[in-house]
Amino acid sequence: MKTIAENWPPVRGDYVTGKPDSRIAVVTLASHLEAFPNAAIWGSSKTENLGVEKIIVNVISNSNIRYVLVCGTESRGHLAGHSLLAIHANGIDEKGRIVGSQGAIPFIENISREAVDRFQRQVTLLDRIGLNDPEEIRKIVEDYRDKGEVYPEEPVVVCAPKKRQASFAVPSSGDVIISEELVMDSMAGIICLAESL
């Protein structure tokens, strides 16, 4: 069984990769701490929406990761760590809101409920919010890097929804006169020269 998605990790962010076959990933929240190479991936997360989404996408695309250490200083207002714990424990509601999150904007918009469910099943979160001691963090990474088995399903690659392409409207009428030379097509929202219509 393939355990790591091609081009892992699929989403860019403020992280470094270490041993892709390690069982532990490290999220340092708003702290920037020196990475230890025995973690699969190591980085910060300051927001309760896009930051949490990136963590989920990068974790579920590597079935080797079974633990996520949440450490470092919590980001004010956004509460990325609290939101990560909440989404793991409670999931999201029908509107994409992280159930139980106290973050400022706790909405997941770019990944599916299935991706969240997979994250909940695949990993155990190690809640050490506030821990900034490099030696203690290194010890946790060493304790968990080989612990347990690979998640028994292929990695999942989540594609972000396609952005709506901007369309260019051609004015068909000048129903609002701005001046002798300029008119506006109020349906298209375009101002153009009166002589061009």
Swiss-Prot record:
InterPro entries: MeTrfase_MtrA/MtxA. Pfam families: MtrA. GO terms for biological process: methylation. The keyword Metal-binding does not apply. Its EC number is 2.1.1.-. It is an enzyme of class 2 (transferase). GO terms for molecular function: methyltransferase activity. Disulfide bonds: none annotated. It comes from the Archaea. Keywords: Methyltransferase, Transferase. The keyword Translocase does not apply. Belongs to the MtrA family. May be part of a complex composed of 3 subunits; MtxA, MtxH and MtxX. This is Putative methyltransferase Mtx subunit A. It comes from Methanosarcina acetivorans (strain ATCC 35395 / DSM 2834 / JCM 12185 / C2A).
